[in-house]
């Protein structure tokens, strides 16, 4: 009977640690890396590079899009920081949990139970906070997607050959070309006519087609960005769904942990299983914190 109780305790405790570790591992390997933020940083810089290539109306939309993308990134990293904080607490608690196996008694068993419940409680709290931050991040992506649709329509109008914006760009090219032709004249009125003819050929045959190609490349850039933002929004939604499942699993195992008797006679194999589960989660925490810039990692107790 005692052995059955011990087996049950080991199963519950091991499952509790592994469930928390699994949620963290999911965040570490999937949720936290789902968006290629380096690409987005480069894209945000590109938004500024194109600022001379669209109308005032389009410029306002581009400014809104840039703000929304930066807001989304801020909230995403806020979620990352929340999980980082959980790791900081969990590593210390789990190290204390492992050390309590030395000269094991009922008081230490009770302390271990409190520790595990604390780890699970903090996990639920921090992952829920991360979930909320991801929701806001997703909403910003969604809003940016809507703005990009409006921008596409605006650019289509701007870049139409009949639009006032396109004509203003053509007029600017012609003015600069003809001014340059006039400045270069040395052969009297006939020279001016010839220079203007050459300028007209350059404008119509080269500069205006180049303008069309440049404007087309700008529109293609924003079309690609629109597709990227839509995919990012889908990825975050999928991440939130996975996280919801993990939070629910931690909640269930926490309830079971609270009702489990911890002070039982463990054999060496049982002790090894529990210690290894705790050490594995400490290592997962270390891996997560290292990837986010922590230089000095928590040492796993050798007991």
UniProtKB/Swiss-Prot annotation:
Alphabetized GO MF terms: identical protein binding; toxin activity
Post-translational modification: In periplasm, it forms a disulfide bond between Cys-87 and Cys-285, which prevents the oligomerization. In outer membrane vesicles, the redox status prevents formation of the disulfide bond, leading to oligomerization and pore formation.
Protein name as annotated: Hemolysin E, chromosomal
Disulfide cysteine pairs (residue numbers): 87-285
Bilayer topology term: Single-pass membrane protein
Organism classification: Bacteria, Pseudomonadati, Pseudomonadota, Gammaproteobacteria, Enterobacterales
One Gene Ontology CC term in the entry: periplasmic space
Pfam families for the chain: HlyE
Record note on quaternary structure: Monomer and oligomer. In periplasm, it is present as a monomer, while in outer membrane vesicles, it oligomerizes to form a pore structure that is active. The pore is formed by a dodecamer.
């Amino acid at each position: 009977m005692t052995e059955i109780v011990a087996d049950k305790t080991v199963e519950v405790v091991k499952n509790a640690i592994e469930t928390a570790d699994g949620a963290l591992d999911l965040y570490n390997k999937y949720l936290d890396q789902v968006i290629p933020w380096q690409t987005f940083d480069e894209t945000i810089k590109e938004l500024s590079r194109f600022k001379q290539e669209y109308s005032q109306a389009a410029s306002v939309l581009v400014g809104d899009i840039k703000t929304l993308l930066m807001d989304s990134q801020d909230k995403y990293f806020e979620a990352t920081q929340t999980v980082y904080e959980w790791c900081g607490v969990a590593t210390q608690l789990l190290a204390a949990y492992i050390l309590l196996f030395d000269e094991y008694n009922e008081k230490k068993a009770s302390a271990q139970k409190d520790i595990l419940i604390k780890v699970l409680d903090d996990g639920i709290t921090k992952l829920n906070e991360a979930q909320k931050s991801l929701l806001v991040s997703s909403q910003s992506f969604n809003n940016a997607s809507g703005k990009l649709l409006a921008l596409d329509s605006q650019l289509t109008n701007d870049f139409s050959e009949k639009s006032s914006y396109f004509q203003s760009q053509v007029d600017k090219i012609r003015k600069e070309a003809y001014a340059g032709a006039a400045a270069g004249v040395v052969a009297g009125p006939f020279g001016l006519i010839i220079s203007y003819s050459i300028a007209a050929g350059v404008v119509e045959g080269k500069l205006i087609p180049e303008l069309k190609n440049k404007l087309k490349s700008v529109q293609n850039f924003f079309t690609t960005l629109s597709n990227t933002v839509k995919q990012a929004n889908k990825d975050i939604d999928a991440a939130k769904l996975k996280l919801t499942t993990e939070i629910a699993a931690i909640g269930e195992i926490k309830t079971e942990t609270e009702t489990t008797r911890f002070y039982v006679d463990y054999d060496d194999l049982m002790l090894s299983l529990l210690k290894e589960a705790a050490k594995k989660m400490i290592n997962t925490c270390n891996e997560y914190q290292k990837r986010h810039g922590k230089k000095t990692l928590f040492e796993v107790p050798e007991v």
